[in-house]
């Protein structure tokens, strides 16, 4: 199983994210994933730069490490035609190292354009139509599309890479795993649940499965404190996380998440063993790759510890 690194824009400035990407490549991570938010989850996180500008810089600052969005929502804040153009551009800038992770989004980021927040089944319809538009535009011809949710009028992309970015689709249930199997090239999921992977495979999905694990390297008690302060929202679950409209709502909703509750979703401290155990759960569920999220500001110490301690503790090539 490949181990990656998360460029989490909700907690880092644009320049820091580019520096983090370089450091992650030097530290031996197999790939990068980048969140795509307008807002942080919690006010204390304090950042949320425009991911696509950061990715252009990452493409130039790194040399060989693959990277993806984790994930971009192409249904409200971004029109799918614009997503098609910027994904094609980043693929060209990175010499073919980019892949496009897509999902049905969160109200947190999408409500800002004032178009409301559709029910999840409608968002999945919109996502399916958006993928259709993106792939059509990557064909390099003029595209006119008059669909149920989107209109495209005589659009053409003039800079399209020879090798198109693979499209991953985030899923947590049967409707979205079917969408990922039918229209995506790989599956994205954040929980090590075998039933998600099996649903994807049963629907005909043959691509790899990519997950994500929150971690916090550091002295154990302090690391748990940082994890709880900045990442307690992860204990709410995605059915809640997709619906809340802003940082104040997440602050309130997560007020009763206790530090010990995070043991279900995260690893922390300086001992590689808890990290390896959490990664093993993903491997046993059928995941092919997992990106670690180092919560908090200590990115350089974490990368050094990964290279010196965690990576060697795993099987060769960063595989648990």
Describe these PLM feature segments.
Residues 1-320:
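Active-site-adjacent structural elements that line small-molecule/cofactor binding pockets in enzymes
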């Amino acid at each position: 199983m490949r181990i990656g690194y998360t460029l989490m824009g909700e907690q880092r400035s644009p320049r820091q994210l580019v520096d983090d990407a370089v450091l992650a490549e030097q530290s031996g991570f197999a790939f990068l994933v980048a969140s795509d938010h307008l807002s942080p989850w919690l006010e204390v996180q304090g950042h949320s730069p425009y991911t696509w500008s950061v990715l252009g810089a990452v493409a130039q600052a790194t040399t060989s490490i693959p990277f993806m969005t984790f994930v971009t929502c192409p249904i409200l804040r971004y029109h799918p035609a614009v997503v098609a153009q910027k994904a094609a551009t980043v693929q060209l800038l990175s010499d073919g190292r980019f892949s496009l992770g897509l999902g049905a989004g969160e109200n947190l980021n999408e409500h800002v354009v004032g178009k409301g927040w559709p029910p999840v089944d409608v968002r999945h319809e919109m996502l399916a139509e958006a993928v259709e538009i993106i792939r059509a535009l990557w064909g390099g011809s003029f595209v006119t599309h008059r669909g149920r949710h989107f209109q495209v009028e005589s659009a053409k992309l003039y800079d399209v890479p020879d090798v198109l970015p693979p499209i991953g689709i985030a899923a947590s249930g049967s409707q979205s795993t079917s969408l990922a199997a039918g229209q995506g090239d790989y599956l994205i999921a954040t929980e090590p649940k075998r039933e998600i992977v099996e649903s994807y495979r049963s629907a005909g999905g043959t691509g790899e499965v990519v997950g994500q694990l929150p971690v916090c390297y550091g002295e154990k008690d302090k690391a748990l404190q940082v994890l709880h302060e900045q990442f307690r929202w992860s204990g709410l679950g995605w059915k809640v996380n997709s619906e809340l409209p802003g940082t104040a709502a997440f602050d309130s909703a997560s007020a009763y998440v206790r530090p010990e509750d995070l043991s279900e979703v995260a690893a922390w401290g300086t001992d590689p063993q808890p990290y390896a155990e959490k990664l093993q759960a993903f491997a046993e569920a059928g995941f092919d790759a997992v990106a670690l999220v180092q919560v908090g500001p200590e990115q350089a110490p974490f990368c050094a510890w990964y290279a010196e301690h965690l990576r060697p503790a795993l099987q060769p090539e960063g595989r648990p």
